[in-house]
Amino acid sequence: MEAKAQTRYLRVTPQKARRVVDLVRGKQATEAVAVLSFAPQSAAEPVRKLVESAMANAKFHADKHSEAFDPAEYVVKAIHVDEGPTMKRFRPRAQGRAGRILKRTSHITVVVAPAVKGAKKTRRTR
Protein backbone atom coordinates (compact mmCIF):
# COMPACT_ATOMS: atom_id res chain seq x y z
CA MET A 1 0.00 0.00 0.00
CA GLU A 2 1.40 3.37 -1.02
CA ALA A 3 1.81 6.14 1.49
CA LYS A 4 2.47 9.78 0.79
CA ALA A 5 3.85 12.71 2.75
CA GLN A 6 4.57 16.25 1.69
CA THR A 7 5.99 19.42 3.10
CA ARG A 8 5.22 22.84 1.72
CA TYR A 9 6.86 26.26 1.95
CA LEU A 10 10.16 24.78 3.13
CA ARG A 11 12.79 27.52 3.28
CA VAL A 12 15.35 25.65 1.18
CA THR A 13 16.01 26.50 -2.44
CA PRO A 14 14.58 23.88 -4.81
CA GLN A 15 17.93 23.51 -6.56
CA LYS A 16 19.66 22.52 -3.31
CA ALA A 17 16.76 20.30 -2.23
CA ARG A 18 16.88 18.39 -5.54
CA ARG A 19 20.53 17.47 -4.89
CA VAL A 20 19.47 15.78 -1.64
CA VAL A 21 16.35 14.16 -3.10
CA ASP A 22 18.39 12.56 -5.88
CA LEU A 23 20.42 10.69 -3.22
CA VAL A 24 17.43 8.65 -2.03
CA ARG A 25 15.16 8.18 -5.04
CA GLY A 26 14.52 4.44 -5.54
CA LYS A 27 16.32 3.35 -2.36
CA GLN A 28 14.84 1.33 0.49
CA ALA A 29 13.16 3.68 2.95
CA THR A 30 15.31 2.56 5.90
CA GLU A 31 18.46 3.01 3.82
CA ALA A 32 17.24 6.45 2.68
CA VAL A 33 16.81 7.56 6.30
CA ALA A 34 20.33 6.34 7.11
CA VAL A 35 21.83 8.17 4.13
CA LEU A 36 20.00 11.39 4.96
CA SER A 37 21.04 11.22 8.63
CA PHE A 38 24.67 11.66 7.63
CA ALA A 39 24.30 13.93 4.60
CA PRO A 40 25.91 17.33 5.26
CA GLN A 41 23.41 19.38 3.25
CA SER A 42 20.94 21.54 5.16
CA ALA A 43 18.01 20.11 3.17
CA ALA A 44 18.84 16.57 4.34
CA GLU A 45 17.12 16.88 7.73
CA PRO A 46 13.70 18.02 6.42
CA VAL A 47 13.81 15.35 3.69
CA ARG A 48 14.71 12.69 6.29
CA LYS A 49 11.78 13.76 8.46
CA LEU A 50 9.53 13.63 5.42
CA VAL A 51 10.57 10.05 4.56
CA GLU A 52 10.00 9.05 8.20
CA SER A 53 6.57 10.69 8.06
CA ALA A 54 5.68 8.77 4.90
CA MET A 55 6.73 5.54 6.64
CA ALA A 56 4.56 6.42 9.65
CA ASN A 57 1.66 7.04 7.27
CA ALA A 58 2.26 3.62 5.68
CA LYS A 59 2.24 1.98 9.12
CA PHE A 60 -1.00 3.80 9.99
CA HIS A 61 -2.70 2.60 6.79
CA ALA A 62 -1.45 -0.96 7.33
CA ASP A 63 -2.79 -1.00 10.90
CA LYS A 64 -6.08 0.51 9.75
CA HIS A 65 -6.58 -2.21 7.14
CA SER A 66 -5.21 -5.01 9.38
CA GLU A 67 -2.24 -5.69 7.11
CA ALA A 68 1.26 -6.70 8.09
CA PHE A 69 3.79 -3.86 8.08
CA ASP A 70 7.49 -4.49 7.49
CA PRO A 71 9.48 -1.25 7.14
CA ALA A 72 12.36 -3.10 5.47
CA GLU A 73 10.30 -3.89 2.37
CA TYR A 74 9.29 -0.28 1.63
CA VAL A 75 11.12 1.75 -1.00
CA VAL A 76 11.03 5.41 -1.95
CA LYS A 77 8.86 5.00 -5.04
CA ALA A 78 8.68 8.69 -5.96
CA ILE A 79 10.14 11.86 -4.53
CA HIS A 80 10.14 15.25 -6.15
CA VAL A 81 10.72 18.91 -5.39
CA ASP A 82 8.52 21.68 -6.71
CA GLU A 83 9.22 25.37 -6.44
CA GLY A 84 7.14 27.32 -3.92
CA PRO A 85 6.61 31.06 -3.76
CA THR A 86 9.65 33.31 -3.68
CA MET A 87 10.00 36.02 -1.04
CA LYS A 88 11.64 39.13 -2.41
CA ARG A 89 13.87 41.24 -0.17
CA PHE A 90 16.14 44.21 -0.82
CA ARG A 91 19.65 44.79 0.45
CA PRO A 92 21.07 48.32 0.48
CA ARG A 93 23.95 48.80 -1.94
CA ALA A 94 26.34 51.61 -2.72
CA GLN A 95 25.18 55.04 -3.91
CA GLY A 96 21.56 54.60 -2.86
CA ARG A 97 20.89 51.53 -4.94
CA ALA A 98 19.19 48.37 -3.74
CA GLY A 99 20.12 44.78 -4.57
CA ARG A 100 17.43 42.17 -4.84
CA ILE A 101 17.52 39.03 -2.70
CA LEU A 102 15.31 36.07 -3.59
CA LYS A 103 14.40 33.78 -0.70
CA ARG A 104 13.12 30.69 -2.46
CA THR A 105 10.88 28.01 -0.98
CA SER A 106 10.23 24.37 -1.89
CA HIS A 107 7.37 21.91 -1.85
CA ILE A 108 8.64 18.31 -1.43
CA THR A 109 6.52 15.18 -1.97
CA VAL A 110 7.50 11.61 -1.05
CA VAL A 111 5.69 8.37 -1.96
CA VAL A 112 6.78 5.11 -0.34
CA ALA A 113 5.47 1.71 -1.40
CA PRO A 114 6.35 -1.94 -0.84
CA ALA A 115 9.02 -3.19 -3.23
CA VAL A 116 7.73 -5.22 -6.16
CA LYS A 117 8.56 -8.89 -5.60
CA GLY A 118 10.89 -10.37 -8.20
CA ALA A 119 11.81 -7.04 -9.76
CA LYS A 120 15.45 -6.74 -10.73
CA LYS A 121 17.40 -3.71 -9.70
CA THR A 122 18.75 -1.97 -12.75
CA ARG A 123 22.11 -0.28 -12.72
CA ARG A 124 22.93 2.61 -14.92
CA THR A 125 25.97 2.16 -17.09
CA ARG A 126 28.18 4.96 -18.20
UniProtKB/Swiss-Prot annotation:
Task: Name the keywords, alphabetized.
Answer: Ribonucleoprotein, Ribosomal protein, RNA-binding, rRNA-binding
Q: Name one GO cellular component term.
A: cytosolic large ribosomal subunit
Question: Highest taxon of the source?
Answer: Bacteria
Q: Which GO terms describe its molecular function?
A: rRNA binding; structural constituent of ribosome
Family annotation (SUPFAM superfamilies): Ribosomal protein L22
Biological processes, Gene Ontology terms? translation
Name of one Pfam family that matches? Ribosomal_L22
Keyword Ribosomal protein among record annotations: yes
What does the UniProt function comment say about this protein?
This protein binds specifically to 23S rRNA; its binding is stimulated by other ribosomal proteins, e.g. L4, L17, and L20. It is important during the early stages of 50S assembly. It makes multiple contacts with different domains of the 23S rRNA in the assembled 50S subunit and ribosome. The globular domain of the protein is located near the polypeptide exit tunnel on the outside of the subunit, while an extended beta-hairpin is found that lines the wall of the exit tunnel in the center of the 70S ribosome.
The entry describes its oligomerization and partners as: Part of the 50S ribosomal subunit.
Which NCBIfam families would you find in this protein's record? rplV_bact (TIGR01044)
What this protein is called in its record is Large ribosomal subunit protein uL22
In which organism is this protein found?
A: Kineococcus radiotolerans (strain ATCC BAA-149 / DSM 14245 / SRS30216)
